[in-house]
Every structure is written in structure tokens, then in C-alpha cells.
Amino acid sequence: MPKERTLTGDGVSLLVREWPGGAPGILLVHGLASSSHIWDLVAPRLSRAGTRTVAYDQRGHGRSGKPSSGYGFGRTGADAAAVIAATRLGRPVAVGHSWGANVVLELAVRSRRRVSGLVLVDGGFLRLRDRFDWPTAEQVLAPPNLSGTPLHEFLEMIQYFLRGQVEITPEVEAVFLSLMRVDAQGNIHPRLSRANHLRILRALWEQDALELLRRVRLPTLILAVRSKPGTADSAGFMEEKERAAGAVRTIGDPVRFEWIEGIHDLPLQRPAALAGRIRRFAAAIEH
């Protein structure tokens, strides 16, 4: 089991979880409307391989504080830097999933001495504004209103959405439960408020990830998920990814682009494969 502690600074508390191991350290950063528990199948594998691993709930998420401001990348990147400093992780490899990839990318460009390399898991290379204007993005990508949904219905929804893709073990179920508060009547309420979700979405829409990738000066591995046609999370984004892949490959060193088969929730679907890619990348840049 990881050790847990709460860090407080800049007006927000951050729930941090640590798995033992040695250098090179690894920082795991989750995505939008997720939590540090998305890494629950990956982090133990990294730790067992001898790598010290730290994950945390980003502001607004999980058991961290939920201020009504500070969701731009300057602030969320500073949160990541604060976790690195407080846990004495040195210059870790920073691994971000989805929005978390955009967070660590911005951190590396603004403060490259904080990290030694980046792994961007199905995020950090798309520009939302290439696909949507803001009013459309706000409408299409707004979160569903799940507040008040009975817990059993929510779990049935998860089973349906991930059918044939991820086995819903007690560990996986716990990941999804970490995203919700359950009231006395057995109904769920998302821990990330709709208002804060939209604040983050706006920051994502405004960020130019491709321009940041051109400016990054650290070894960077982009792991883009190639979803099968018809899977729920392919939803038009495969064409967007294909176009972005071409643009990213023109950047060249130190940015490397690779496809990996799976679904967007890769840390749950293929934790062993993902942990292996992270370990090999970290070992290569250490030497």
C-alpha cells in the first residue's frame, strides 16, 4: 500500500501517494475528471521494479482541495513542481495521462530543471481549438450531469462503457468510486465540480500543445492510443490523432512519437505494458 499525506501550499491541499523505490523517481499525473487512483495498477509495478513513484490528486479532484480558481496550466504545473519538491523526488520522469500530459508538458517548458523527461500518455499533443471553437467545445465536451445518480446505476454505466475492454475487478471499481462522493441515500456526486471542469477545459482549449512540444528540451515520449473503430473513446479523435502525429513527427529530437493499441483509459486496460514502456524510457535517459 502506498503512503499517503497531504501537502498544503498556495491555498490548496494536495493528496499525495508514495510507493517506495529508488532513482530515477517517477511522478504520475492523472487526467481531467480522474484521480491518482487511475495509476493504482501501474504504480505498484513501477515500485516492484525498484522505482520510487509518486502520484497525487490534482486540485479540484479526488481528496485534494477544490478552490474555484487556479486551473490554468501555470498553476497546475506549479502544483506538480510543489509535489516534486515536497517529496524530494529529485528530477523525476513526469508521466501524464490525458490532461495530466498537458500539465507536465507545460511544467517542462516553464521549469525544465524540475524533471528529467516526459511520458505523455494519450495527451499533450492535440490542439482542441483545431477541432472546435470555444462555444462548441464547451457544449460537446461538458461533463454529463451525474449528480444524484444511484451508485448501482453508475457502476452499471461503467460496466457498459468498458465492456470487452477492461475487466471490472474490485481494484478497477475502486478507481471509479474515487471520482465520486456517495451520499447517505446511496447517490453519487462527482468530486470535480462542473464549474471547475469547464475551467480546466477552457485552459486545454487555449493551450497550444504542438508549440510547447517544439520548445521542450527534454527527452519526451508520446504514447498515443490507437483505438479500434467503434470503441466508445475513438469517437472521431482517431482522425485528429493521425493528423497530430504527422505534425509531431516533424519536430524530431528530443520528442518521440509511438502508437500503443488500447483505449484512452490505458492505465486500467494495459497497466503492465504501460509500466514497461515507462521503465524502459526512464532507464534509457538515466544512462
Describe each PLM feature range.
Residues 262-271:
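Catalytic histidine-centered segment of alpha/beta-hydrolase-like enzymes
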Residues 1-26, 48-51, 89-90, 245-247, ...:
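Alpha/beta-hydrolase fold catalytic core
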Residues 109, 116-150:
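Flexible "cap/lid" loop of the alpha/beta hydrolase fold
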Residues 7-10, 43, 48, 54, ...:
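Active-site loop/oxyanion-hole signature of alpha/beta-hydrolase fold enzymes
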